[in-house]
Design a protein with these regions (language model features):
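Short beta-strand-to-loop acidic/aromatic patch adjacent to the donor-nucleotide binding site
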Residues: 122-134
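C-terminal catalytic/acceptor-binding lobe
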Residues: 56-58, 206-309
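Conserved catalytic core of nucleotide-sugar-dependent glycosyltransferases
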Residues: 136-228
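N-proximal low-complexity "stem/linker" segments adjacent to membrane-targeting elements
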Residues: 36-103
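Active-site nucleotide-sugar/metal-binding loop of Leloir-type enzymes
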Residues: 111-125
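Conserved donor sugar-nucleotide recognition element shared by glycan-biosynthetic enzymes
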Residues: 105-109, 240
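Arg/Lys-rich low-complexity patches in intrinsically disordered regions that function as generic
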Residues: 2-13, 37
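Short, Asp-centered acidic motifs that coordinate Mg2+ and/or phosphate
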Residues: 125, 149-150, 254
């Protein structure tokens, strides 16, 4: 009697016998697949972030936004609408100053600082937000709540793969819930306490300059090179990197909150030549497709939920 031949199939790394083949084919059948229970998906529970609302109400943040050509992105516009609603609900005082048609960004930032310092003495913080940054109300709330001199959020450069606009520091100070000391942070989303500028006046690189842009004379005494380009260690530094370097020269520290992940709007040239690559990497997209945010629930000091929309 002839022996029964064993059905086999060679694969790249092993040999599959008939018994294994039958098991694989059975498990792959539509009937078996239909009766399989789908694994339970974990609920997308919101991450909880707690802030001290009483403390926030004692602050007055002045938001400064350079808007070259008087333009801002849709992401930035909708962010401000949500922030205005949240600040009103919580009773947080804030003001806004924009800068249009200033092609020299360093001078534009210095002008915004002068207006911040000269407009009102009761403003406690200057918050730089660029016109191409998308953010959520809780992002600004948690930065204020940190109560440190200089702190920013993380936003990517306008390129792929993602690289953050920040420079780390070896053995930098770390705090709870994502607080991280860095050497430099971008001014696209940067919060600065008022007294920082008073202390920077002691730095030799910070110099007064003539008001030749038609600014109100009451701001003349505040026009100084807080933001300027510089060459250090054979590297050309942008105005925000120079600001950070000068502050650290005086013993100051700079932090980022790793929870504050922002959106950085840019332009992209679409063509048939890169269509296949885009579809593989990011899928079908529309120019203004809404970015899905991780759910975050903001709590006050008593543990009550704070509306942020």
């Amino acid at each position: 009697m002839a022996e029964k031949k064993t059905r086999t199939r060679k694969t790249k790394n092993t040999e599959v016998t008939e018994a294994k083949l039958e098991k694989i084919e059975t498990e792959a059948s539509p009937e078996v697949q239909a009766n399989k229970e789908e694994p339970k998906k974990e609920e997308n529970k919101p991450h909880q972030v707690q802030v001290n609302v009483d403390f926030l109400r004692k602050t007055k943040v002045h938001i400064a936004m350079p808007c070259y050509g008087g333009m801002l992105t849709e992401a930035t516009f909708t962010s401000f609408i949500k922030w205005a609603n949240t600040a009103k609900q919580l009773g947080i005082d804030w003001t806004l100053e924009t800068m249009v048609n200033e092609s020299l960004i360093s001078r534009g930032r210095n002008t915004l600082v002068a207006k911040f310092l000269g407009a009102s003495e009761d403003t406690t913080h200057l918050m730089f937000i660029d016109a191409d940054i998308g953010w959520e109300p809780w992002h600004l709330l948690v930065l204020l709540n940190r109560d440190v001199d200089v702190i920013g959020g993380l936003y990517p450069m306008k390129s792929l793969p993602v690289k953050w606009v920040v420079n780390g520091i070896k053995d930098g100070e770390e705090g709870p819930d994502g607080l991280q000391e860095v050497s430099k942070a971008g001014t696209g989303f940067l919060l600065i306490k008022r007294h920082v500028f008073d202390k920077l006046n002691d730095h030799p690189a910070v110099k007064p300059y003539k008001n030749d842009i038609g600014l109100d004379v009451k701001f003349d005494q505040f026009l100084k090179t807080y933001f300027d380009t510089a060459v250090r260690e054979n590297r050309y530094l942008s105005e925000d990197w120079t600001f950070c370097a000068n502050w650290r020269d005086l013993g100051g520290k700079i932090f980022i909150d790793r929870r504050v992940l922002l959106r950085h709007s840019g332009s992209y040239v679409f063509s048939h030549e890169n269509q296949e690559h885009l579809l593989k990497t990011i899928g079908p997209m529309y120019l203004n497709q809404q970015v899905k945010e991780n759910k975050v629930k903001i709590l006050d000091e008593a543990g009550n939920s704070i509306p942020t929309t």
